[in-house]
Regions:
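Generic detector of short, locally flexible boundary/turn motifs and exposed helical patches
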Residues: 20-22, 30-34, 42-44, 54-55, ...
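Structured C-terminal helix/loop/strand segments within mature extracytoplasmic catalytic/sensor domains
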Residues: 133, 137-138, 142-241
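Short, charged low-complexity intrinsically disordered segments located at boundaries
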Residues: 35-42, 82-88, 98-99, 107-115, ...
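Membrane-targeting and insertion segments and their boundary/processing signals
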Residues: 23-30, 38-42, 51, 111-119, ...
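Generic signal for short, ordered secondary-structure residues
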Residues: 35, 47, 59-60, 120, ...
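Active-site-adjacent loops and short helices of periplasmic peptidoglycan-processing enzymes
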Residues: 1-105, 227
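Mid-domain, small-residue-enriched loop/turn segments at the edges of structured enzyme/sensor domains
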Residues: 66-145, 149-150
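Flexible glycine/proline-enriched surface loops and loop-helix/loop-strand junctions
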Residues: 48-52, 59-64, 121-129, 215-217
Length: 241
């Protein structure tokens, strides 16, 4: 869900409704458990929208994602996805709400959710019902990346900025893991319980290509990451053959 939020943020910037230099005051009540660092910081911090976008993508900061999701609005994120030709993308929950669904904890706050997530407690609720949860097809995810690389999803400068952020993603155990050293990849990973994914653009010697590898019903360990990395390598070898 963080890739669509990122694109929607820059679309709002293009439209003049959001400023990348705009500061968002962080409060402890805004914390979201899971990946990221904002939830460990003192309140009163005022990162810019660009700072939040960088944190959301590079270290998959959940709190940053929810702050941007609230700033742009869920309806706007989904409308942008329809406008760019990715109608399968649905984001009915913030990440906090998604975790509340997963753990059967409506209204629960940071501390309670963190403990339940650590224990993998809860039935999953609507979060595991495909028609009601966060979802997207690999085809539409690839379409987003293809249009970013073609500089057609936003204005060229915004596409450049989005791709620059995506190239800074820190998790490199999936699509980039087995590729030749120095291969540039602009990508975003996704992980929640038994779902592990990665999608992006690989800049191969003979041209760039979009790739989306999505898995579900899998274990939460690096063996799954290695399987995704092997798929990525197979695609790379076929592409560059």
């Amino acid at each position: 869900m963080k890739l669509p939020i990122l694109v929607a943020v820059f679309d709002e910037v293009r439209a003049g409704r959001v400023d990348l230099a705009e500061r968002v005051t962080y409060r402890r009540a805004m914390r979201v458990p899971g990946s990221g660092v904002l939830h460990d910081l003192d309140e009163g911090l005022a990162p810019t929208v660009r700072d939040l976008a960088m944190l959301m993508i590079t270290i998959s900061d959940n709190t940053a994602a929810d702050l941007l999701f609230e700033r742009v609005g869920r309806e706007r994120v989904e409308q942008v996805m329809r406008d760019v030709g990715a109608p399968s993308v649905r984001i009915p929950f913030s990440i906090l709400e998604l975790f509340q669904e997963l753990t059967d904890s409506p209204g629960a706050g940071y501390d309670a959710l963190r403990e339940k997530l650590r224990a993998s407690a809860g039935s999953g609720g609507r979060a595991i019902v495909a028609e009601q949860s966060v979802r997207a097809t690999p085809r539409d995810i690839c379409r987003i990346f293809e249009r970013l690389e073609a500089r057609s999803i936003l204005d060229p400068a915004s596409c450049d900025a989005v791709l620059d952020i995506l190239k800074r993603t820190k998790t490199d155990t999936r699509i980039p893991a087995l590729l030749p050293k120095g291969t540039v990849v602009a990508h975003k990973t996704g992980t929640i319980r038994t779902v592990r994914c990665d999608a992006g653009i690989v800049y191969a010697p003979n041209g760039a290509y979009a790739i989306a590898i999505l898995s579900k019903g899998v274990g939460n360990d690096l063996r799954v990451d290695m399987a995704l990395a092997e798929i990525s390598l197979a695609v790379y070898e076929e592409w560059t053959r």
